[in-house]
């Protein structure tokens, strides 16, 4: 076996009002380095992990089983830059990594569409797995058993993330959402989402940022779970942000700011006393998606 590497970017789901349908790939990565070995070995950040208990390996075996093959003995070393349970798509990145691990070890020659299909079946929705596979901003939905998606690869903004030192499970954040919305409310929420995507495509980032903060699907309900939600949004605007939103289900928040302003915004926000325990990071948008290093 020729050694190879797999890199999968983080992702931010929803991007404001694009609830369960829009995601953005971000330049934090889950890396797998794979080499030949006499037995199956898996290491996470240098620590040996039993493969039967490892999520990524279990995903890889599941995909291999679908194709009627067994994965060969190998040594897999995982390193992960993506914070867990922070709304940055850590589970989706792990799913995509497992799918690609099976693809490479089993010579399955999976298409991106097949990877998206498998990832969506496992994750339950495509808004995080899609950008981790394709890169950029991806709008996607499941129609019957078919997944449709559109990718936007040219977004002239910078991203600054505010990552608190707390975890928030998606299941907890999802439980605070209403079971249904009345027709007028849903129509307005849908219109805001549609106009946000149109603004991004037309590069009207000022309008896009304004609309992102007008989400009605999830942020009004989840914001109560997020420390300093209103404060971060207000302060970021003072330093030039177009808008500030929850990343996925939270607790991380993201600011969209003019191209070139990211480092300045990051520097100013990191000095705020209320954010002393946060990682305030300027994170580039990833446009490559999953990548293989040989």
UniProtKB/Swiss-Prot annotation:
Family: Belongs to the GHMP kinase family. Homoserine kinase subfamily.
InterPro entries hit by this protein: GHMP_kinase_C_dom, GHMP_kinase_C_sf, GHMP_kinase_N_dom, GHMP_knse_ATP-bd_CS, Homoserine_kinase, Ribosomal_Su5_D2-typ_SF, Ribsml_uS5_D2-typ_fold_subgr
Binding-site residues for ATP, renumbered to this chain: 83-93
Protein origin, superkingdom: Bacteria
Gene Ontology biological process terms, A to Z: threonine biosynthetic process
GO terms of molecular function: ATP binding; homoserine kinase activity
Keyword annotations of the record: Amino-acid biosynthesis, ATP-binding, Cytoplasm, Kinase, Nucleotide-binding, Threonine biosynthesis, Transferase
PROSITE patterns per record: GHMP_KINASES_ATP
Its biological purpose: Catalyzes the ATP-dependent phosphorylation of L-homoserine to L-homoserine phosphate.
Protein name: Homoserine kinase
Enzyme category, top tier: transferase
Catalysed reactions listed for this entry: L-homoserine + ATP = O-phospho-L-homoserine + ADP + H(+)
Organism: Oceanobacillus iheyensis (strain DSM 14371 / CIP 107618 / JCM 11309 / KCTC 3954 / HTE831)
Subcellular compartments: Cytoplasm
Involved pathway(s): Amino-acid biosynthesis; L-threonine biosynthesis; L-threonine from L-aspartate: step 4/5
GO cellular component: cytoplasm
Chief subcellular location: cytoplasm
Listed EC numbers: 2.7.1.39
């Amino acid at each position: 076996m020729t050694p190879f590497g797999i890199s999968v970017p983080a992702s931010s789901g929803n991007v404001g009002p694009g609830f369960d349908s829009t995601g953005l790939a971000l330049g934090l990565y889950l890396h797998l380095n794979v080499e030949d070995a006499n037995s199956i070995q898996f290491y996470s950040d240098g620590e040996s992990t039993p493969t039967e208990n490892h999520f990524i390996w279990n995903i890889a075996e599941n995909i291999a089983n679908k194709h009627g093959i067994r994965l060969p003995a190998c040594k897999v070393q995982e390193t992960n830059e993506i914070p867990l349970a922070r709304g940055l798509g850590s589970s989706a990145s792990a799913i995509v990594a497992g799918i690609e691990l099976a693809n490479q070890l089993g010579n399955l020659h999976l298409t991106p569409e097949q990877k998206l299909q498998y990832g969506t079946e496992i994750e339950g929705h495509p808004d995080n797995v899609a950008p981790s596979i394709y890169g950029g901003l991806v709008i996607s939905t499941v129609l019957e058993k078919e997944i449709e998606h559109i990718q936007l690869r040219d977004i002239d903004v910078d991203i600054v993330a505010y990552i608190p030192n707390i975890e928030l499970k998606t299941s907890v954040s999802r439980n605070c959402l209403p079971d249904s919305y009345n027709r007028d409310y849903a129509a307005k929420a849908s219109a805001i989402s549609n106009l946000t995507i149109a603004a991004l495509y037309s590069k009207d980032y000022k309008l896009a940022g304004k609309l992102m903060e007008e989400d009605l699907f999830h942020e009004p309900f989840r914001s109560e779970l997020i420390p300093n939600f209103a404060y971060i949004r207000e302060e970021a605007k003072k330093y030039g942000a177009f808008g500030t939103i929850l990343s996925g289900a939270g607790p991380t928040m993201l600011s969209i700011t003019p191209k070139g302003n990211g480092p300045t915004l990051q520097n100013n926000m990191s000095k705020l006393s209320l954010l002393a325990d946060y990682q305030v990071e300027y994170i580039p948008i990833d446009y490559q998606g999953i990548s293989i290093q040989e």
